[in-house]
């Protein structure tokens, strides 16, 4: 499910604490606030979205640079996944996040998540030589219905 339960929030805090200790990073309240905010966002987000969330919550004034550097830290700690959709970087929480795939519209750039049991099974049954898979993500590129419709309308108007 997409709702984060309290137990998961505690767990990710614990993962962060261990990561910071092992790597000799400071345990700043900002880092925990950013983590908490990220884990309250459903689906994908970019730095601007995260920045606005943080600003609106008013807990911490965090610069975009700080957010960016913190996210790099979280990716290394396996708490955040980075996606490169065309030229925009999008992020999402990694812990306890069910495997899902992405449909990406090449016209408007909209990213839609979807799950598919058949795909899941097919990938699970795929034999990988000398390789142990930990996770995966599938990107399917195409044109969304909104853009398809807009294109059709343009053709008619000519």
Model-derived features: where do they sit?
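Short helix-capping/hinge SLiMs at alpha-helix to coil transitions
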Residues: 25, 39-42, 57-58
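DNA-recognition alpha helix
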Residues: 46-59
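Basic amphipathic alpha-helical segments that dock to polyanions
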Residues: 67-77
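Non-DNA-binding regulatory cores of transcription-related proteins
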Residues: 76-158
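Short alpha-helical segments that sit at the start of domains
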Residues: 8-35
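Short, small-residue-biased leader/transition segments that mark boundaries at the very start
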Residues: 1-6
């Amino acid at each position: 499910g997409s709702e984060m339960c309290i137990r998961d929030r505690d767990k990710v805090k614990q993962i962060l604490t261990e990561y910071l200790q092992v790597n000799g990073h400071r345990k700043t309240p900002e880092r925990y606030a950013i983590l908490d905010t990220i884990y309250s966002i459903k689906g994908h987000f970019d730095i601007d979205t995260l920045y606005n969330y943080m600003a609106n919550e008013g807990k911490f004034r965090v610069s975009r640079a700080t957010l960016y550097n913190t996210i790099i830290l979280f990716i290394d700690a396996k708490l955040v996944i980075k996606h490169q959709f065309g030229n925009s970087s999008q992020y999402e929480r990694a812990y306890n996040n069910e495997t899902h795939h992405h449909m990406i519209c090449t016209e408007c750039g909209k990213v839609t998540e979807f799950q598919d049991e058949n795909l899941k099974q097919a990938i699970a049954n795929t034999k990988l030589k000398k390789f142990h898979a930990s996770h995966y993500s599938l990107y399917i590129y195409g044109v969304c219905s909104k853009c398809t419709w807009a294109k059709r309308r343009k053709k008619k108007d000519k």
